[in-house]
């Protein structure tokens, strides 16, 4: 299993996605996280807020399921496809297959 979990946080809706990302790698953490909407070729950067939650805010509804790409502090790169579904629920944790 992948060493990462995505939990949808409060404030998430059709235009906003807020995620707690748990990365289970000793001594390493997320440096950059990007999201790609369903049917898109464009990666969009998430910003980390003061609470350690990664957020993306959009002017128009986001289209899931969502793919994620990240770079860790130690330079580990990974892409996870279709992790968070279009009908995500706040408080639910999603893990890549």
From Swiss-Prot:
It comes from the Eukaryota. It comes from Lolium perenne (Perennial ryegrass). GO terms for biological process: plant-type cell wall loosening. The keyword ATP-binding does not apply. Belongs to the expansin family. Expansin B subfamily. Coiled coil: none annotated. Keywords: Allergen, Secreted. InterPro entries: Allergen_Lolp2, Expansin_CBD, Expansin_CBD_sf. This is Pollen allergen Lol p 2-A. GO terms for cellular component: extracellular region. Pfam families: Expansin_C (PF01357). Residues 15-96 form the Expansin-like CBD domain. It is found in: Secreted.
């Amino acid at each position: 299993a992948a060493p990462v979990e995505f939990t949808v946080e409060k404030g998430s809706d059709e235009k906003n996605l807020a995620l707690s990302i748990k990365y289970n790698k000793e001594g390493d953490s997320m440096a950059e996280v990007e999201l790609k909407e369903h049917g898109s070729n464009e990666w969009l950067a998430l910003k980390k807020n003061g609470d350690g939650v990664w957020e993306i805010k959009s002017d128009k509804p986001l289209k899931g399921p969502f793919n994620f790409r990240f770079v860790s502090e130690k330079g580990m790169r990974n892409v996870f496809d279709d992790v968070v579904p279009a009908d995500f629920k706040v408080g639910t944790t999603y893990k890549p297959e």
